[in-house]
């Protein structure tokens, strides 16, 4: 709730999917075994008509705003010892929790990381490669 957004529009809605029936329904839009093991999901949605647009270049900021809030959510889960994953390549046509005036941006599965989960080291570019100091 504390994430910033362009001109404080807060163009988001978060749908927490907890019940077994609802989870099974949601799993049809992203058919991966690891995804199906999550005890809950959060569908991160953007309000379609509440999108600040920068006048100079018509850049829309709704998706950016939802992304900022979603990452705050993921960081909060991590701080509590939970695992999360940003899923955006789901089949939107099979995402079956429509909310009038909202569109899904990402689905975040959240749960405890299995003890036998292979944790891959994150490959990140060097600071010098992504940052210029002027």
Protein language model regions, located:
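Short, solvent-exposed amphipathic alpha-helical segments in soluble enzyme
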Residues: 31-33, 58-60, 124-125
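Short, conserved aromatic-histidine micro-motifs
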Residues: 35-36, 94-113
């Amino acid at each position: 709730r504390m994430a910033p957004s362009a001109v404080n529009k807060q163009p988001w809605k978060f749908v927490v999917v907890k019940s077994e029936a609802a989870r099974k329904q949601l799993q049809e839009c992203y058919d991966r075994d690891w995804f199906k093991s999550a005890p809950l999901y959060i569908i991160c949605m953007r309000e379609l008509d509440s999108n600040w647009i920068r006048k100079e270049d018509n850049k829309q900021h709704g998706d950016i705003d939802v992304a900022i809030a979603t990452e705050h959510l993921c960081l909060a889960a991590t701080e509590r010892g939970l695992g999360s994953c940003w899923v955006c390549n789901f089949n939107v046509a099979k995402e079956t929790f429509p909310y009038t005036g909202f569109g899904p941006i990402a689905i975040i599965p959240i749960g405890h990381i299995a003890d036998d989960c292979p944790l891959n080291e994150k490959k990140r570019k060097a600071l010098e490669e992504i940052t210029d100091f002027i």
